[in-house]
């Protein structure tokens, strides 16, 4: 297995978006006066590794179920193209799981034993997404899973590890990140509706029709911006407005785009999650630093 093939399996372009909820939660914790560098680094590592597990497991199980046909419109997957063997990919998955478990144990030892449950759920979730007896992605629950894992678990969990407690602000921020992240999957499943119908992958849009996708995309954008409400100041609103305009333009592009051309929208949506994280950082930072001076809501 060459490095290039490993990279295709790891899918580095998916990683910045998976880090977004972790980084924003770390920033919020730091502004609340809690920052532990060691646990912060370990949390970032667990976040990256969990995403890689999900990517590799996804390839493995989709291949096994025959969901990645030759007429695939998505990015190149070495396994379904016969460039790597099933065993090689399985071994890579096992190595990644071991690395994640070890990093996770270090994190649990440094913070709270409760995290063991969260960690087990993260690994199970990453695999159960396309594998196991009830693959979420095949039952129209992919978006819900993304919201839970990339929103509440990643954001809320990161904040809890730093602060030892949760705040409503942290939950609002984590949810905002979750809704923003959902759109990556929305575009992905919108693109794949035809193949998914054939391979019995009953995604939301296979179940309720393709026209739901752009509507859900828009709803996610609006919800993510609205959920930053605890932190808004005038500058924050301007920043979110710029983000909103860009994403709504992308949503209109999505409506006019078909098939493999949607990969561009997918990449730009993933970049949009990173952009939203930057926006959230600006919004939070301004709120904490200047608060009421800029017409923001009073911070307790």
Question: Language-model features: where?
Answer:
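Topogenic membrane-insertion module of multi-pass membrane proteins
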Residues: 1-42, 46, 133-134, 139
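Functional transmembrane core segments of multi-pass inner-membrane proteins
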Residues: 146-193, 211-214, 293
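Intramembrane alpha-helical segments
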Residues: 77-165
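Small-residue-rich segments of transmembrane alpha-helices in multi-pass membrane proteins
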Residues: 16-25, 144-159, 206-210, 267-280
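Membrane-embedded alpha-helical segments that form the functional core of polytopic membrane enzymes
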Residues: 22, 32-60, 116-124, 167-187
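Multi-pass membrane catalytic core of lipid/isoprenoid biosynthesis enzymes
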Residues: 70-113, 201-235, 271-274
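Acidic (Asp/Glu-rich) catalytic motifs at the cytosolic membrane interface
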Residues: 49-73, 182-205
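Extended hydrophobic alpha-helices typical of membrane-associated regions
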Residues: 233-293
